[in-house]
Amino acid sequence: MSRVAICPGSFDPVTVGHLDVITRAANMFDKVIVVVMTNSSKSPSFSAEERMSMITKACEGLDNVYVDCYEGLLAEYAAMRDAGAIVKGLRAMSDFEYEFQMALTNKKLNPNVETVFLTTKAENMYLSSSMVKEIARMGGDIREFVPDVIHNEIINRLQKERN
């Protein structure tokens, strides 16, 4: 099995929950590629480049973590990068049902890739990028939900949307 793993997501924006999963994956694999998946049917608050920049800042010090962006099938991306694993964080059973279906699909499309599920820490079970954005837009404090190094960047963008 390849010791390369992919941590895919929209990361709009990256949260401490995402960072926890990325850090744990970095301890399990030789190389972890955090891939910002783009979807033309969605309207993210941050551009793909901004999300990549925030992830890079948040992952500073994790020497085996790399950041990339991709629009297309995750199974194809895994094959292009010779990744043997897709790492996904799970918050609740509702996450599992969707992610299990995606794991089976990715395995069908790329038999060389396995999906590894990491359960989130209890303190992050409720945390989502959508929740962080809503709190920030309403002027709430998001410090405990996002990495310190990108806090101001997120606040500045989302509070501008509010005004």
Feature locations, PLM:
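Nucleotidyltransferase catalytic core that binds NTPs
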Residues: 1-163
